[in-house]
Amino acid sequence: MQRYNEKSFEDLIEKHLLQSKYIKGNPKDYDKALCLDTNLLWEFLKTTQPKQIEELQKRQRGTDLQKNFFERLKSQIEKEGLLKILKEGVEVLGVFFKLAYDKPPNQKNPDTWKNYQSNLFSVVRQLHYSTKNNNSLDMVIFLNGLPLFSFELKNKLSGQSVVDAIEQYKKDRSPHESLFTHHTLAHFALDNDLVYMSTKLEGAKTHFSPFNRGLNDGSGELDRECGAGNPATDSIKTAYLWEKILQKDSLLHLILQMIKPGGKSNTVIFARYHQLDVVRKLCQIVQKEGVGGRYLIQHSAGSGKSNSIAWLACALVGLSKQEKVIFDSVLVITDRIILDRQLQDIIEAFCPIKGVVGAITKGSRQLKEAISEGKKIIISTIQKFPYILEDIPSMRDKKFAIIIDEAHSSQGGKYAQDLAKTTGKDQENQQEDLETFLSKAIQAKKFQPNASYFAFSATPKPETLELFGMQTSQGKFIPFHLYSMKQAIEEGFILDVLAHYITYKDYAKVMSTILNDPHYEKNLALKKLKRYIRDHPKSIQAKTEVMLNHFYSYVHTQIKGRAKAMVITDSRKSALEYFKAFQAQLKQEGYPHKALVAFSGEINLKGKTYSEASLNHMPETYTPKAFEKDDYRFLIVADKYQTGFDQPLLHTMYVDKVLSGVACVQTLSRLNRTHPDKKNTCILDFVNNAQEIIKAFEPYYKQNSLEGPSDLNKPFDLKTHLNNYEVYTQEEVEAFNLALFNNAHLFQIHVMLDAMVQRYSALEKDLQQEFYSKAKAYIKGYEFLVQILPFEDISLEKLFRLLVELIKKLPRDKNPEDITKVVALKQYRLEKEQEAKLTLTGQAELKPFQAV
């Protein structure tokens, strides 16, 4: 009868590897002092580098050749790290030796191909590795006699699991053993269901990360479950490790391309499973389908997105098909200026070929220079990218891979149009009429066939899904690759920010007549009244008191007494008032901490001008660094540091602003960064209710999808509606576009627009609001839809160009700004409404563009 024990699990893995042309290694050939299988290493060197051995023999002057070589190799590994030696080789007495050969892109060079085929992969079971005791490892994988990975296996049918394997590494594998300090890249603990991995053994402090496929295996398909772990298959759940990852070519790619040196000596950055998976799947589909595709990668916060982008950029540079390089250049575009340099540093560190990474900080000439200098990966921000478009006609015959970081915020339409201009085919330099000019303008806004687009986003908007997502047979749009928020939380890479959510409700008694005043538009007056109450010194004073009481009662002892909080406000004025209230109450109560404030620009209040720098008494660029200091515990923000801001000590958020959609997810997600001492988070919300927050998060918890394509009739419907208001005539639309084309004087443009503004002002107030809303919707919708319309319609383009300028001149909001003269706040109080864990199902679906 079959015994389902640990040995049978080892048998299964070994059998598969031996069938894959691994060598069955002999534990007796392993030199414990050198940490090498000396026989296999020397066999590899004799086969691939006999001339170097001969030269080394001459320089040795009769001494023990193998002994000296092995000792030199050991010392270099301990000095430089195994990864560097595998990638760059080792020099012995001036003779250079390679220790591994990567797979060449083709077989043009017989010697290179032969050397690659001469790599010796071996598997050793029950390896006794120590000179101090008789401990053994279940399994070790070697490449050319050098140990790469160790394995501890557990069979769940024998009553043990991956947890026991991890404990075995922590308790029974001394981190001081030579094999574990310098001579291996990673250590795998696994059972039949789960795989965990560590790059450094540190005894009880050893950290193991999941190396699992995820229940959806990276797929964005809608019918798949999402979360941590591995999906059920027709084999053992963890079979992918030996059936795919440990296969020869896969292993070479992994160690030579997807493992990078870490920040500390002899440490490495090992690609997580989803990072390895997305890079490989994208390269495979590009090799299969060629240039011109669009791919959406929805990877949650905590996915290591910057590293994924760096690995992908480096992989695309070297990608070839039929012995031809697929892309001439890889452009990496980010919408966060402060990350431009950071991302460049990561890509440079990850790229195996040095000197091929450049950054655009000025304009088009610098881009041309970068390409002529052989820069294959070029990094820029959205803010700089439009300036490099005009003087680069030579680029338009090249093929591009365009990697877009944080595509959710950059894909309203205009950004993709700028990219399309860069990669578009060159136009003849000739005289052209207005119709030809507009036709070219429309074409320039569309995606170009000589570029592939790779869009990364944790929270893709409907437009992003339609532009870059894959369309299913049911017409829905889904991401090409998905690493869900649910999986990131379950794997411990981010915290669940909705696990402790507190909502407050406020009650106010006001004396006011504005709701019955005909001079005030009712809905707008109500909105102003709510803002008046929210920003009133009484309410800010009361909310500040609640925040500080909560912080010093429950929060400040978290993270071993280092916890910090962020206050989300809805305006610079509100941020300023909160900052003053915090300063006063912190001083009054004798609390030992301070607050910082963050907002852009300046605000003038009661004749005095304030800025972030003047209030904090430091340049605004210093604010994030100052917030790291222990005495600064509160950061009060107004539309700043709500995206892309990583501060692991941030534990609690106080929200006094309406949040919805992607902005809600991004803002609250500032809390999700992990820290060894951070066990939980807390949100205290004065404005939003629990259901509103759940609605915002639902689309991004598991799979995200768009229910169908946009209705291409919508811009035509909006155009008809707008025409019916008779704010402009068709003759005026034509004349305005001709004036723009002919570079008419500014006064002529204003004269044309003023006539339309006069007609707009004569409309009923409700009709004014309708026209304004429809005009904004048209501009936003057209910017997006023009990229995917399968035809040209110049009339849509003409109206778009008119409305972009007209809407800037339309008068808005005639209600007096100062309502304090007709409103008085008499009473104000706060009550806790709810304290709960907000539970997500991930069942929501986004809707396509709709006309207003």
What are the roles of these predicted feature ranges?
Residues G412-V497:
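Post-DEXD/H (motif II) to motif III coupling segment of the RecA-like Helicase ATP-binding lobe
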Residues E348-E390:
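Inter-Walker segment of RecA-like/P-loop motor cores
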Residues R670-P699:
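Conserved segment of the helicase C-terminal RecA-like domain
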Residues G227-S235, E463-R562, F579:
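Interdomain helical connector at the RecA1-RecA2 junction of SF1/SF2 helicase-like NTPases
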Residues K375-E406, S410-K421, E428-I442, N616-P624, ...:
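Conserved RecA-like ASCE ATPase "motif II neighborhood" in helicase/translocase motors
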Residues K15, Q19-S20, K46-R61, L65-K67, ...:
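Catalytic cores and motor modules of nucleic-acid processing enzymes
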Residues M1-S329, I338, Q342-I353, Q383, ...:
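ATP-dependent helicase/translocase motor core
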Residues K530-V637:
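Conserved C-terminal RecA-like helicase domain
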